[in-house]
């Protein structure tokens, strides 16, 4: 492969040419200065990056040794004393309040769903950006949120019986979200706007008003017969679409043809766990899509029902306010970008000594450069109206690593001529050392932080790896009931509120991983806003629309205010180790656990390694489709490695299980023409060997991360195909 030397950086030609030909020409940034500054950042900060990773390993060695001598901690005071002694658990400083400035309301004050989407896939990225609004009728009709009983089957064509149930559900929702005086929404016959108020006439001819006139936010069309009514509740919008020409509208007394909800308020465009980018060629795909999003010209041809069309970013729409004055409603999700963490290095660029550069530094510099199309001196200001860039930084271990990310961002700002603290930071609370030192982590980024989020999946993977030597872990399905989990979730909210995040930043909760089970999500995920989270992750635009209903039912700002006086969750609970005290699992239970873990690992890894797909819906052992990414992979691999280490299972048992479940995964992928079967090809299947590595060498992986194995095996496969 060819490289271009720029100030001591040997950049792969495909990446260099992308920067020089596609990114830099549209910006008021001198190319030579950019590369000189980029090189200085890499050469100054890469040694610090390496030192922080070495510290992770040093701490793990000490913790492993302690567990070998003591087992799972019985005396929590003694355990905490040890963690303080080695510098794992740090002293907590005085109280403070974050001081982040120029934060868009989508993050600072609007509570609502958040999508995480692989930015490597242009279609998914566009769908997510456009998921700021979604049809509640469609979301209910097309999912199991409405049961298919009593003749309400989905079918291949429109089922009026099902439609009636959807409409009834939505009318009940409107009765609680924007109630009318002396009238139910099911009895509405017409709308008009008079004297700055929404006037409703019932099918009986009676006039009614909104119980709270502040719920009326605007309209489109003629005031006497509007085509769109905009309502607002708890800071987020509802749009009622009136159109008698449609099948639904014609049959409706008020000609309501649809009800749309403001849905994915924010979206994380992901360069990390949901993608498979292992070389310069892959990274250019990532960066090119981010460029299209920042320039506003990303497009993708989409084939549907025998025809195709070009999907682009939705434009904002003009509405008339209650007073008749025009205003604009945002129709795109506010975009954050998730860079990779501090661990990985990339072959896309080599430093002056021939070392691969830290990928997190590369991401910060290049995604930051591209963001100038939105926030630079001549930026569009179509993503961030306040001129901020939002970077989610994952997998950081403790405040020293957060401070290092702050230093990277500062250096990038200087290189790009941006004011200090333009680049905001989202802190993923997904590593144990960050959790227990969360207040100090936030302090390290107090002028930049816009987001803290519990990542149950990665956090469980780190929990298992950190305490690998303590004993065999409880079964994976029992982990959600472990003492540390609820304490961790509450602690994140408690610390966030203590540090003044309310009204300034997001306090987030994790992913609903079952995209087909929307009825269950509607029932259960309301727990997130009730717990004080003003955002939570959803797996699809449809899920975002359904989850948005929870933010109409729960006033998160009020919940947060009520939680400020709650006693902080206990550190001792967070530090409790989820080992099985007296494991008495039957052979059948052990095998079922192995089967379930192996199936998830293989189903995800085979598509990652063979096809470069970083996020997959993988059927579990009960045939429930689960969203799998590297975080879920980390749990499953570490869990199997833990049981192997503590002799709950044998290596032979794991290999037999993997081989048997490979055949199951092969059958599940039989309809995919690009799929390469693993069964009968175990020695030559690079994907199967990667899955085995993740388990059999799980204890050796840094903090239990899966990226080193996946990247190595994917590069091996790509090299094999180009040989």
From Swiss-Prot:
The modification Cysteine sulfenic acid (-SOH) is found at residue 615. Glyoxylate binds at residues 338, 430, 455-458. Its main location: cytoplasm. Its cofactor is Mg(2+). Mg(2+) binds at residues 430, 458. It is found in: Cytoplasm. Acetyl-CoA binds at residues 116, 123-124, 274, 311, 539. The active site is at residues 338, 629. The keyword Protein biosynthesis does not apply. Keywords: Cytoplasm, Glyoxylate bypass, Magnesium, Metal-binding, Oxidation, Transferase, Tricarboxylic acid cycle. It catalyses: glyoxylate + acetyl-CoA + H2O = (S)-malate + CoA + H(+). InterPro entries: Malate_synth_C_sf, Malate_synth_sf, Malate_synthase_TIM, Malate_synthG, MS_C, MS_N, MS_N_TIM-barrel_dom, MSG_insertion. GO terms for molecular function: magnesium ion binding; malate synthase activity. GO terms for biological process: glyoxylate catabolic process; glyoxylate cycle; tricarboxylic acid cycle. It is an enzyme of class 2 (transferase). It holds the Pfam family MSG_insertion. GO terms for cellular component: cytosol. Pathway: Carbohydrate metabolism; glyoxylate cycle; (S)-malate from isocitrate: step 2/2. Its EC number is 2.3.3.9. It comes from the Bacteria. Belongs to the malate synthase family. GlcB subfamily. Monomer. Involved in the glycolate utilization. Catalyzes the condensation and subsequent hydrolysis of acetyl-coenzyme A (acetyl-CoA) and glyoxylate to form malate and CoA. PANTHER family: MALATE SYNTHASE G (PTHR42739:SF1). This is Malate synthase G. It comes from Rhizobium johnstonii (strain DSM 114642 / LMG 32736 / 3841) (Rhizobium leguminosarum bv. viciae).
């Amino acid at each position: 492969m060819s490289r271009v030397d720029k100030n001591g950086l040997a950049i792969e030609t495909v990446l260099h040419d992308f920067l020089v030909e596609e990114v830099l020409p549209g910006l008021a940034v001198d190319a030579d200065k950019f590369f000189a500054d980029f090189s200085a950042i890499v050469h100054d900060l890469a040694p610090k990056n390496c030192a922080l990773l070495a510290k992770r390993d040093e701490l793990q060695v000490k913790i492993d040794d302690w567990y070998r001598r003591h087992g799972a901690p019985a005396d929590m005071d003694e355990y905490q004393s040890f963690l303080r002694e080695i510098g794992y658990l740090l002293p907590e400083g005085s109280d403070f309040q974050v001081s982040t400035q120029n934060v868009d309301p989508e993050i600072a004050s609007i509570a609502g769903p958040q999508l995480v989407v692989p930015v490597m896939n242009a279609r998914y990225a566009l769908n997510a950006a456009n998921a700021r609004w979604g049809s509640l009728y469609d979301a209910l009709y097309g999912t199991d949120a409405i049961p298919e009983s009593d003749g309400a089957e989905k079918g291949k064509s429109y089922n009026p019986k099902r439609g009636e149930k959807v409409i009834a559900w939505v009318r009940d929702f409107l009765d609680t979200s924007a109630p009318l005086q002396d009238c139910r929404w099911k009895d509405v016959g017409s709308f008009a706007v008079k004297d700055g108020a929404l006037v409703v006439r019932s099918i009986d001819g009676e006039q009614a008003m909104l119980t709270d006139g502040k719920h009326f936010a605007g309209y489109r069309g003629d005031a006497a017969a509007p085509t769109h009514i905009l309502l607002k509740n708890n800071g987020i919008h509802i749009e009622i679409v009136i159109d008698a020409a449609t099948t639904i509208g014609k049959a409706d007394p008020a000609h309501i043809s649809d009800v749309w909800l403001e849905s994915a308020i924010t979206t994380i465009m992901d360069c990390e766990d949901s993608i498979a980018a292992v070389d310069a060629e892959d990274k250019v795909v990532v960066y090119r899509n981010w460029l299209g999003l920042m320039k506003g010209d990303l497009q993708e041809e989409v084939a549907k029902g025998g025809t195709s069309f070009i999907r682009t970013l939705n434009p904002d729409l003009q509405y008339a306010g209650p007073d008749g004055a025009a205003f604009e409603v945002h129709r795109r999700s506010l975009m954050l970008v998730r860079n990779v963490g501090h661990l990985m290095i990339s072959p896309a660029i080599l430093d002056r000594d021939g070392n691969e550069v830290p990928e997190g530094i590369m991401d910060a510099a290049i995604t930051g450069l591209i963001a100038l199309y939105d926030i630079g001196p001549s930026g569009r200001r179509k993503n961030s109206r306040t001129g901020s860039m939002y970077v989610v930084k994952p997998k950081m271990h403790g405040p020293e690593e957060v401070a290092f990310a702050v230093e990277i961002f500062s250096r990038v700002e200087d290189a790009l001529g941006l004011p200090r603290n333009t680049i905001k930071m989202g802190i993923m609370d997904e590593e144990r050392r960050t959790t227990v030192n969360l207040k100090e982590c936030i302090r390290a980024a107090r002028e930049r932080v816009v987001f803290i989020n519990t990542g149950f999946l990665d956090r469980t993977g780190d929990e298992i790896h950190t305490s690998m030597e303590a004993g065999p872990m409880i079964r994976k399905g029992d982990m959600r009931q472990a003492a540390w989990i609820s304490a961790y979730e509450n602690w994140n909210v408690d610390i966030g509120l203590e540090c003044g995040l309310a009204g300034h930043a997001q306090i987030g909760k994790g992913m609903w991983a079952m995209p087909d089970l929307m009825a269950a999500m509607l029932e259960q995920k309301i727990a997130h806003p009730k717990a004080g989270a003003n955002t939570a992750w959803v797996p699809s635009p449809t899920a975002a629309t359904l989850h948005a209903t929870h933010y109409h039912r729960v006033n998160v700002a009020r919940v947060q205010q009520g939680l400020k006086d709650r006693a902080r969750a206990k550190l001792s609970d967070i530090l409790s180790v989820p080992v099985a005290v007296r494991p008495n699992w039957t052979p059948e239970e052990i095998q079922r656990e192995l089967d379930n873990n192996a199936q998830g690992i293989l189903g995800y890894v085979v598509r990652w390694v063979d096809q470069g797909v970083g996020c997959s819906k993988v059927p579990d052992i009960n045939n429930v489709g689960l969203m799998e990414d590297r975080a879920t992979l980390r749990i499953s691999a570490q869990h199997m490695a833990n049981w192997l280490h503590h002799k709950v299972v044998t290596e032979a048992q794991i290999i037999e299980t993997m081989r048997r479940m490979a055949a199951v995964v092969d059958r599940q992928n039989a309809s995919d023409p690009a799929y390469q079967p693993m069964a009968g090809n175990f020695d030559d299947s690079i994907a199967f060997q990667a899955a085995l590595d993740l388990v059999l060498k799980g204890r050796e992986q840094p903090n239990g991360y899966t990226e080193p194995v996946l990247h190595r095996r994917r590069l091996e496969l790509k090299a094999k195909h180009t040989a």
